[in-house]
Amino acid sequence: MKAATAIIDRRALRHNFQQIRKFAPHSRLIAVVKANAYGHGLLETAKILNQADCYGVARIGEALMLRSGGIVKPILLLEGFFSASDLPVLVANNIETAVHSEEQLQALENAGLERPIRVWMKLDTGMHRLGVRPEQAEAFYRRLCACPNVAQPVNFMSHFSCADEPDSGRTEVQLACFDDFVRGKTGEQSIAASGGILLWPQSHRDMVRPGIIMYGVSPQADLSLAADHYGLQPAMTLQSSLIAVREHKAGEPVGYGGAWVAQRDTRLGVVAIGYGDGYPRSAPSGTPVLINGREVPIVGRVSMDMISVDLGPQAADRVGDNVIMWGPGLPVEKVAACTGISAYELITKLTSRVAMEYIGEEA
């Protein structure tokens, strides 16, 4: 009998990677492994995805963990460096960086580096989060071209705000803005992340940046467009065990606050997982889990270490039986729809006490 465990399927990760190759056959792939590879384990996932052309991370610490773990392929800091003191570290470890601000540009201009750094100028085409505004972009670009600490040519990237919405006109506007700026320039281009890869093939360019789809999760909220619609397989199964099976009478409440009351005699199961493991405390009664091949609903409030589920009056489930919170047979997208929490957040917020197990052949 096991407590909360995240089982990561190497075969699913590799399958998804090859599916993405089919979606963007003329682009190279930046495997986005930030945030502990979306909860799948940073270094292990990078090793599984050893056919990636580059790895994308958010923080310099993530990049250094990859390097210390033996990863030698290019690594790109998607948010860029945070201070001038990071620059020698980037040089020493051959790490590429996004550049999106005047402060970063000045740090590059003023640094004394042993060799130039490969940079990606980030253009704000409409996300309005990071990036150089279009009206300032040409002057910014000229300074990057003139900077001896910048390896030439300068490369270009941006990020869509609504790529997971196929009917949104914003993506076309952003792409047109990007194209207007990069036209006639020689650097590599990257603008498509997961949504762009699936829905906007005209955005694929030199490199694409798969994130959530690499882990077998759809970026779209519509459950009819979950990962299996695109031939993707869930790489993570979050599971635990029944630690108690109890008779429960009609009219009896369960859990903190007595928020759920049984309408009939039934059998309740107690599962060893809770918000202390990263399972969402906000999951309402009715959120499904999978036990012995059937969905059963959570009842009552999620506790720190446990949830209760209504097994049904005739249930034959026993202590020790496996319980799947999400994975094959119960897509995380469905749990996300029930809880009101995005699938991105569900898979990345698991806590350190959740055990990690990897299945499938190693590379």
From Swiss-Prot:
Enzyme Commission code(s) on record: 5.1.1.1
Keywords: Isomerase, Pyridoxal phosphate
Amino acids binding substrate: R129, M304
Cofactor(s) the protein needs: pyridoxal 5'-phosphate
GO MF term set: alanine racemase activity; pyridoxal phosphate binding
Family annotation (InterPro entries): Ala_racemase, Ala_racemase/Decarboxylase_C, Ala_racemase_C, Ala_racemase_N, Ala_racemase_pyridoxalP-BS, PLP-binding_barrel
GO biological process, one term: D-alanine biosynthetic process
Active-site annotation: K34, Y256
A GO term from the CC aspect: cytosol
Enzymatic reactions: L-alanine = D-alanine
Record SMART domains: Ala_racemase_C
A Pfam family recorded for this sequence: Ala_racemase_C
Coiled coil: none
Pathway: Amino-acid biosynthesis; D-alanine biosynthesis; D-alanine from L-alanine: step 1/1
Modified positions (N6-(pyridoxal phosphate)lysine) in chain numbering: K34
The family this protein is said to belong to: Belongs to the alanine racemase family.
Function field: Catalyzes the interconversion of L-alanine and D-alanine. May also act on other amino acids.
Cited PANTHER family: ALANINE RACEMASE, ALANINE RACEMASE, BIOSYNTHETIC
Designated name of the protein: Alanine racemase
Native source species: Edwardsiella ictaluri (strain 93-146)
Encoding gene (name): alr
